[in-house]
Amino acid sequence: MKYKVVYRIIIVIAFALSGCFNLDSEKIKSDERFYHSAFMDWSMKKKSLAKNYTAIIMADPQPWRLNSGDPNGISNREPWLKINEQVASVIKAQKAAFHIVNGDLTEFGQQRNYDDYKNVYKKFEAPVYEGLGNHDYANNVGHCTIPEAYDFYQDACALSAVLRMLSEIRQYRRQLSYFNADVTESSILLPDENIHEIKGSLSYSWDYGDVHYVQLHNYPSYTVRLKGQSTKVHINKSLDWLKKDLAAADARGKVTIINFHDARAASIDGESFFIRKKNAKDLSVFKSIITAHNVKAIFVGHTHYQSYCRAKNDKVFGNIPVYTAGALFNGDYYLVEVKGKTIRVKAYNGAIGRPLLIKDLGIIGEGTQFFASCSQL
């Protein structure tokens, strides 16, 4: 039998070399890409079984924002690239299992800004999992077109951010363990067009070792309606989805880290979009959800400076600690060391070209210092 198999292989090779078989090189390349992709997906799921690992949580790369100049001006591009390429090299050298970016991937949702972020921060050997912030979609709703793509709909930039995120979610679905996402897609057939309809908060979650990670994007109660030439988007609150997702994670015996963008304490300057008195009902629901489940910590961005807060019974967060990541364009990030269900957080800065430890914030939940309030409500 063995000799028959070998003989058949020799015959196939001979026919191929003689030209009797037309081996399509493009098809071979396509198959190679497919099998490579499938292997990578399997490999990433296997790695997620690890109990001990490090992760890096960061926010606000926001090209081309700096602490001076026009964040939308081309004159800021080269200085932004110089600073962020240095920060990225520092982060890459720390060899984390994965990275999380909690929003403001762009300054105004535009593709050229996203491309610079991608070329700087998505070339690590380990994956990067993204969240959207107010600068990616909320800030440009109704007044940002993409003329270079002949897209003159006023929601064009916000839509492009949503569609990029949807593409990421499709990829994550193949690669992440116990992946869950709050999004549905459908086609509406009309007499003269086909509408792609997207509904949900775009929130997603996954397990890595004993930890369940959740990404809620801008903030948990954010809603918006977007319209393009052949696309309609209904971004809904993530609260109902979050409640079910956390219950499922609890049932699997996981502890949870929640990520989103804006948890800035209440203020009068209009830059705190989630924690506002007018959102009191949603804030109360959010608190009831997170305090009823095994949530270890919340990681956010938005403010552009690193901070930590934990209260005994905050009106929004209960006694769950909140870690604000600072801004990547300033070099800020958190290194998260995971050993089973024990999680240690260290604040770093990479702006000087090496990892500078700003503060070891210790093991989550073991601190004895409490603030009077984190939400300032």
Question: PLM ranges: what are they?
Answer:
Residues 57-59, 99-104, 128-134, 257-261, ...:
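Active-site neighborhood of phospho(di)ester-bond hydrolases with catalytic His/Asp-centered motifs
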Residues 13-19:
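Hydrophobic h-region of N-terminal signal peptides that target proteins for export
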Residues 21-113:
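N-terminal active-site segment of His-dependent metallophosphoesterases
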